[in-house]
């Protein structure tokens, strides 16, 4: 192994905690001297195509730590739920660095799945359904790819994962990787598996009493 490198990168992976503002309970950028650049959660200054509302939840390797810093699961879920409520009327689609939640660009497309890691999977299921329908639900500019930043197929990828009800917040890089189950829109889904790695040929997702109103 490489113990020195492991120690170095483990420390680096915790650096986001120094950017957490305990008063606003969000992450903000700092300058080289360690001072806040600003504390406007909707400003993109200091961010790459994001803002504090969109990017705070992106520490997918450290959600338990984020929960602790925020003051508990309920606090995190209430704050994130508020962000989704603010973005719903605009179909969760904004330009770069704009809005509370944006599914038109890469930085925030995992946000709906954070609820599951904070003990409220029903909120993940609810908002996954809403986002998929409103941001990816058709091929029109209003209900489809209206200004979406399609880099390397990521927006199409998150749309497909929402539709089949599977997602991995950590990108399947854990020692024991797993998928979260959300809310598939189809009654039956068959995924053909690579026989070089799996004994069985298909992975089947079967839903019962599936409807727009019965998403849990």
Provide a role label for each language-model segment.
Residues 198, 209-216:
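C-terminal beta-sandwich/jelly-roll accessory domains of carbohydrate-active enzymes
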Residues 1-204:
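Active-site core of glycosidic bond-cleaving carbohydrate-active enzymes
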């Amino acid at each position: 192994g490489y113990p020195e490198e492991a120690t170095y990168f483990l420390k680096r992976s915790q650096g986001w905690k120094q950017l957490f503002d305990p008063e606003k309970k969000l992450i903000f950028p700092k300058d080289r001297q360690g001072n806040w650049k600003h504390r406007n959660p909707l400003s993109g200054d200091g961010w790459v195509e994001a803002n504090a509302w969109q990017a705070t939840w992106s520490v997918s390797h450290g959600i338990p730590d984020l929960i602790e810093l925020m003051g508990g699961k309920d606090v995190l879920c209430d704050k994130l739920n508020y962000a989704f409520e603010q973005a719903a009327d605009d179909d969760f689609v904004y330009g770069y660095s704009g809005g509370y939640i944006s599914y038109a660009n890469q930085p925030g497309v995992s946000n709906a799945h954070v609820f599951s890691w904070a003990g409220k999977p029903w909120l993940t299921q609810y908002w996954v359904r809403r986002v998929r329908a409103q941001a990816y639900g058709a091929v029109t500019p209003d209900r489809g790819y209206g200004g979406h930043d399609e880099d390397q197929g990521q927006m199409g990828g998150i749309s497909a994962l929402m539709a089949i009800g599977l997602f991995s917040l950590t990108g399947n890089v854990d020692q024991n990787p797993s998928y979260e189950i959300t809310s598939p829109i189809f009654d039956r889904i068959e995924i053909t598996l690579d026989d070089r790695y799996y004994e069985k040929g298909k992975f089947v997702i079967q839903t019962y009493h599936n409807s727009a109103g019965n998403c849990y």
